[in-house]
Amino acid sequence: MKTTLASLKKGQKATITDFNIDAIPLKLLEMGCLPGNIVELLQVAPLGDPIYITVNDSHVAIRRETAIEIDVELLQEFLL
């Protein structure tokens, strides 16, 4: 089952595995939102958009529509 950044719950960490290059802003790539890097979901806005993440020691708010385009794999400690 494919997991996306948008499906993480608050506090969960995951490794970025893939993304749709055409849907990701260049600024996110420059900040380290790349395959192999660990991302953590810090907060979700009251209406569910945007979401607040940390990646590569940077805190970033991104739209849910962008987060859906980023595939992740949950870190072992968060798997049930």
Give the role of each language-model region.
Residues 1-80:
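Compact, glycine-rich, soluble single-domain proteins
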